[in-house]
């Protein structure tokens, strides 16, 4: 690409506002680029508004979806809906077909501010969703407060305040909102290398990008580790499960795989959507600025605009009750997107067997399945820890020791139809359960019980 200022200035000349000198050094942008970009942004805007609008409609209409955890999904859909409506179609689409921004400087600032606040809100809401899922899946047994509508509302208020804080600075002179790329849209000024702009970009990079991404990485990494460890432990304990528990274990294993896959997709989607913007901004401030061409600056815009499309797909369509609501209200979407009707029915069955209640945080059936399986597994582990291990002997007070749960043996303890042994004596025939030795000094199996020693008399002296 040439570095000399071209004679034909029509591509960057704008009578309504100033254009940064950096963009004037590049040659004419072909018309095909403008038209292709306009079509792409228009499609993203229409699909983003439609998809997120459906999400908002279904989550507000369907009572079973109105849980505290799903308030984050609604907030994400609202921010993406507004992001698509204002920052995509129609303003940028019209500008692309006209081949320049025609709405003036004031509209440029409003456009940049709305894009900033709702773009950052989308990022921060995703981090809140990851925190909620981590609390439900990664720490199901923790003695922490359950998610409530009030707590979710306060977290959403924090997201709005956080996003506004980092978006309003350029309005008051800490940075600026200017034209970027092929000069058909406005965003944060990352080209100017003065102290105000540089500090604004660095702070936004740390607090508005790195901070949320660290939260997302931490939460989903621990979710994947939790489901992986849970799968190994359930495999080791599978032989002790009855038919109903085994069914739940198999359902939980399927839920684990879904959750792990969704976690990987979420992190990948986040990086693909917002990392290009961060890279270009840092490159413009600290690297060879000539590398930031109109095309290099415009690519991050396309990735960011597209995030408003796949966010509802990842966060909403993966929700079993949401798919059920789609099937009831918009059956044509099921046909169009080729959702498996059997999968929708399976989701209904899963929700029936293991319901996700508001008291449990409103998690999906997959999360509820896993939570119940982990609770069952922990209960069995507690029983094992409380009961004397093989080779140890219970006290004289009977078998099992008073207050101890029965061992996790088939049929439980005592075996069905057998009365408990006399206090202080070893079990009769059929006792103890297979694999557990009798107390030390017990008479052989089948021998009649001996008389108990008088109170205060040593047992060995009494027998002698």
Curated annotation (Swiss-Prot):
Superkingdom: Eukaryota
UniProt region (Disordered), positions on chain: 344-464
Compositional bias per record (Pro residues), positions renumbered to this chain: 416-425, 434-452
Pfam families on file: 7tm_1 (PF00001), XYPPX (PF02162)
Modified how: Contains one covalently linked retinal chromophore. Upon light absorption, the covalently bound 11-cis-retinal is converted to all-trans-retinal. After hydrolysis of the Schiff base and release of the covalently bound all-trans-retinal, active rhodopsin is regenerated by binding of a fresh molecule of 11-cis-retinal.
Cellular location(s): Cell projection, Rhabdomere membrane
Glycosylation: residue positions: 8
Cytoplasmic-side segments: 59-70, 132-151, 225-261, 316-464
GO biological process: phototransduction; visual perception
Membrane-traversing stretches: 34-58, 71-97, 110-131, 152-172, 200-224, 262-283, 294-315
Family in the record: Belongs to the G-protein coupled receptor 1 family. Opsin subfamily.
Function: Photoreceptor required for image-forming vision at low light intensity. Light-induced isomerization of 11-cis to all-trans retinal triggers a conformational change that activates signaling via G-proteins. Signaling mediates the activation of phospholipase C. Subsequent receptor phosphorylation mediates displacement of the bound G-protein alpha subunit by arrestin and terminates signaling.
Name this polypeptide is given: Rhodopsin
């Amino acid at each position: 690409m040439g570095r000399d200022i071209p004679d034909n200035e029509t591509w960057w000349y704008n009578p309504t506002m100033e254009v940064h000198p950096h963009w004037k050094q590049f040659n004419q942008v072909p018309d095909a680029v403008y038209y292709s970009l306009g079509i792409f942004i228009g499609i993203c805007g229409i699909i983003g508004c439609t998809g997120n609008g459906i999400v908002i409609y279904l989550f507000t209409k369907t009572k079973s979806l109105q849980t505290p955890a799903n308030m984050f999904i609604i907030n994400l859909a609202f921010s993406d809906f507004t992001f698509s409506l204002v920052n995509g179609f129609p303003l940028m689409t019209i500008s692309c077909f006209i081949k320049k921004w025609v709405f003036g400087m004031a509209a440029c600032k409003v456009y940049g501010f709305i894009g900033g606040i709702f773009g950052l809100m989308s990022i921060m809401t995703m981090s809140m969703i990851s925190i909620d899922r981590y609390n439900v899946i990664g720490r199901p047994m923790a003695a922490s407060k359950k998610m409530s509508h009030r707590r979710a509302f306060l977290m959403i208020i924090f997201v709005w305040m956080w996003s506004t804080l980092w978006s309003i600075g350029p309005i008051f002179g800490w940075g600026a909102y200017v034209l970027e790329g092929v000069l058909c849209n406005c965003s944060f000024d990352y080209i100017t290398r003065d102290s105000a702009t540089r500090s604004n970009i660095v702070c936004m990079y740390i607090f508005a990008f790195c901070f949320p991404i660290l939260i997302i990485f931490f939460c989903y990494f621990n979710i994947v580790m939790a489901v992986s460890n849970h799968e190994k432990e359930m495999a080791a304990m599978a032989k002790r499960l009855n038919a109903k528990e085994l069914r739940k274990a198999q359902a939980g294993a399927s839920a684990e795989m879904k959750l792990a896959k969704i976690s990987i997709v979420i992190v990948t989607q986040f990086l693909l959507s917002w990392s290009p913007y961060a890279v270009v901004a840092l490159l413009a401030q600290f690297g060879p600025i000539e590398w930031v061409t109109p095309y290099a600056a415009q690519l991050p815009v396309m990735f960011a605009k597209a995030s408003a499309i796949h966010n509802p797909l990842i966060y909403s369509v993966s929700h079993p009750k949401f798919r059920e609501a789609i099937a009831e209200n918009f059956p044509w979407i099921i046909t169009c997107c080729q959702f498996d009707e059997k999968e929708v029915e399976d989701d209904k069955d899963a929700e029936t067997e293991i319901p996700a209640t508001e008291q449990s945080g409103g998690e999906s059936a997959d999360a509820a399945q896993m939570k119940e399986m982990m609770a069952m597994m922990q209960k069995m582990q507690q029983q094992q820890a409380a009961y004397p291990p093989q080779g140890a002997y219970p006290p004289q007070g009977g078998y099992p020791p008073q207050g101890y749960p029965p061992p996790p043996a088939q049929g439980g303890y005592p075996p069905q139809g057998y009365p408990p042994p006399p206090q202080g004596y070893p079990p009769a025939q059929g006792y103890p359960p297979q694999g557990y030795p009798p107390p030390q000094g017990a008479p052989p199996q089948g021998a009649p019980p001996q008389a108990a020693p008088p109170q205060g008399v040593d047992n060995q002296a009494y027998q002698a």
